[in-house]
Amino acid sequence: MGNQFKTLALLAALSGLLIAISYWVIGGSSGLMIGIGLAAVTNLLSWYQSDKIALAVYRAQAVSESQAPKLYRTVQRLSQRANIPMPGVYIVPGQTANAFATGRDPEHAAVAVTEGILNILPEDELEAVIAHELTHIINRDTLTQAVAATVAGAISFLAQMVSYSLWFGGIGGRDNERGGNPLGVLLTVVLAPIAATIIQLAISRTREFSADAGSARLTGNPRALARALQRLEATARQMPLNANPAFEPLLIINPISGQFLGNLFSSHPSTEARVQALLKLEKQLPTIA
């Protein structure tokens, strides 16, 4: 319950940040009402369309059992073991190696992996990665992450539009109420995306450890996920998956993890920390299974 409250508070903070941007940029009650409207639309859109948005961002393509038999049967088998509806199965084109899950609940969920991950992971490691993603679905992390990504993306987009407007003739200041202050606008453009990113980090980091543990319980093989994470990190650094940074928290591995600045501003814990946690969990597995 504590984690749920924290997550709801952080999501509310993201929406509040979106409203604040509109207030400072447009000014007064007009800016406030527009901001509230934007926050409402963005949250509703991400709630009902989160799976479609994330899949579109990564250009994921739905596949059938005949098209990707090993992947499809792995998702099917683990879904039955976890006692959840089987999610949609998608493949992201490209040789980078990564995976993610999305959807507002287990009945409206999808699991996506890249072509690269299918080429480099042996069967037990692929199973561990799929189990990790299914745990995100079971824990409803997919909804939280998608809402956070959509709102953070809207904040970054709005801040970018404001910066363009500053270059081409200025904005705001037409409302006779408070708002449209040039310094406030400038600070908003610079600080809002950073604040949105920090809030996203607070939402997503602990969820990766929980999903790793869920994978270990579901497969009974935490070492397989540890090996997969190490393999994925090495490959992702060489061939990062290019997409909107707001949606990077959805991925199982962050390409820049392992570096100090990468860890500081990463939506994921370091791969080293995750591997250590999994190896500790391996010793406890007979007790927790």
Swiss-Prot record:
Binds 1 zinc ion per subunit. GO terms for cellular component: plasma membrane. The active site is at residue 133. Its main location: membrane. Its cofactor is Zn(2+). Its EC number is 3.4.24.-. It is found in: Cell inner membrane. This is Protease HtpX homolog. The keyword Kinase does not apply. Signal peptide: none annotated. It comes from Nostoc sp. (strain PCC 7120 / SAG 25.82 / UTEX 2576). Pfam families: Peptidase_M48. The keyword DNA-binding does not apply. Belongs to the peptidase M48B family. It is a multi-pass membrane protein. Keywords: Cell inner membrane, Cell membrane, Hydrolase, Membrane, Metal-binding, Metalloprotease, Protease, Transmembrane, Transmembrane helix, Zinc. InterPro entries: HtpX_protease (IPR050083), Pept_M48_protease_HtpX (IPR022919), Peptidase_M48 (IPR001915). One of its GO terms (biological process) is proteolysis. Zn(2+) binds at residues 132, 136, 208. It is an enzyme of class 3 (hydrolase). The gene is htpX. GO terms for molecular function: metalloendopeptidase activity; zinc ion binding. The chain crosses the membrane at residues 8-28, 29-49, 151-171, 183-203.
